[in-house]
A protein has these predicted regions:
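N-terminal glycine-rich phosphate/pyrophosphate-binding loop and immediately adjacent elements
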Residues: 20-154
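Glycine-centered tight beta-turn/hairpin loop motif at sheet-sheet or coil-to-beta transitions
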Residues: 113-116, 284-288
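Core beta-strand elements of the Rossmann-like FAD/NAD(P) dinucleotide-binding domain
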Residues: 20-22, 285-295, 299
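Extreme N-terminal leader/targeting segments of oxidoreductases
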Residues: 2-24, 42-45
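Rossmann-like flavin
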Residues: 114-219
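Residues forming anionic-ligand binding surfaces in small-molecule and nucleic-acid pockets
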Residues: 218-230
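Helical element adjacent to the flavin cofactor pocket in flavoenzyme catalytic cores
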Residues: 228-283, 287
Length: 301
């Protein structure tokens, strides 16, 4: 929804009186760049150019092969890809429905510690029961925890919806967003320490902290809740490896007259009358290129 709002804003920018090679140029072909290119192509009818410095598109969806086996560099599993979910619907739009998602087995994760192991089930109720049976003295805190992460997840969705509304309408929606406002400002560690006594249980609940990149002492509980709820219906993997994601999007861009160029490193964004209007850089051979567009979007990472 936020992305759709940004796409709408693109059409409201002041127009520069000059001819352009493309409607939009996107720097970087990671999933953010490719998703934006796909949506601009499909929803706005844009002719889009994607420029990638690397020799492959796709960002962390890259794969490589060794001795006949294929390995992913970034994608381990993805949550909320069950048919009918919001994430699946959005992804099907971005990919043209060309990516199939295979559910991982019932036990999709095992959290192995020196003296105990906990299995994460793709069935929410089964997972909660596993935690309660293993840590019965924390029963009430466990149930409260799941209510809290649900509340935060709902609040984030509400906050996203509010961002699409005019200010007068958004204000009361944000005012009632109490769960997000309260829990987003505390760390994951602070929440756990305030609600749980068992250190082993605390460790289990944050076993997936690597997915959001910060340890519990530094991460917002709201972000933790977003990731935790993301996997409550299990995990999925793209059939045929993660590279099928980029492979599904590139034809959408090219089919509308756009281009996706690898080995093209952007060195400068051109600006005219205070507005970005093009890019220059060099390709693999060292040849300088120059492209212009009404909209310049950078996903360089």
């Amino acid at each position: 929804n936020n992305l759709h709002f940004e796409l709408r804003k693109l059409t409201k920018r002041s127009k520069i009186k000059m001819s352009f090679d493309y409607d939009a140029i996107i720097i970087g072909s990671g999933m953010g760049g490719l998703a934006t290119a796909s949506l601009l192509t499909q929803l706005k009818g844009f002719k889009v150019l994607v420029l990638e410095k690397h020799f492959k598109v796709g960002g962390f969806t890259h794969t490589f092969s060794r001795h006949g086996y294929k390995f992913d560099v970034g994608v381990h599993y993805v949550g909320e890809m069950q048919p009918g979910s919001r994430s699946r619907q959005l992804f099907d739009l971005v990919s043209g429905g060309a990516v199939d998602w295979a559910p991982l087995p019932d036990i999709y994760d095992k959290f192995v510690y020196p003296d105990f192991t906990v299995c994460a089930s793709n069935n929410r109720a089964v997972y909660i029961n596993e935690l309660v049976n293993r840590f019965p003295h924390e029963r009430s805190a466990i149930h409260k925890y799941f209510k809290d992460i649900d509340a935060v997840n709902l609040s984030i969705q509400t906050k996203t919806t509010a961002s699409l509304l005019p200010g007068v309408l958004a204000a009361p929606v944000n005012a009632f967003n109490s769960a997000f406002n309260k829990l987003a400002i505390i760390s994951t560690a602070d929440y756990l320490n305030a609600n749980f006594k068992d250190n082993k249980l605390k460790a289990v609940l944050v076993s997936q902290w690597g997915d959001y990149g910060l340890p519990p002492s530094l991460s917002s509980f709201a972000i933790h809740a977003l990731i935790a709820t993301h996997f409550l219906n299990g995990a999925f993997y793209p059939t045929g490896s993660a590279e099928t994601i980029a492979q599904s999007i590139v034809p959408i861009i090219k089919g509308a007259g756009g281009d996706v160029l690898v080995n093209h490193g952007v060195e400068e964004i051109l600006v005219k009358n205070g507005t970005a209007c093009g890019v220059t850089g060099k390709d693999q051979s060292g040849t300088t290129f120059r492209f212009t567009a009404r909209h310049i979007i950078s996903y360089a990472g």
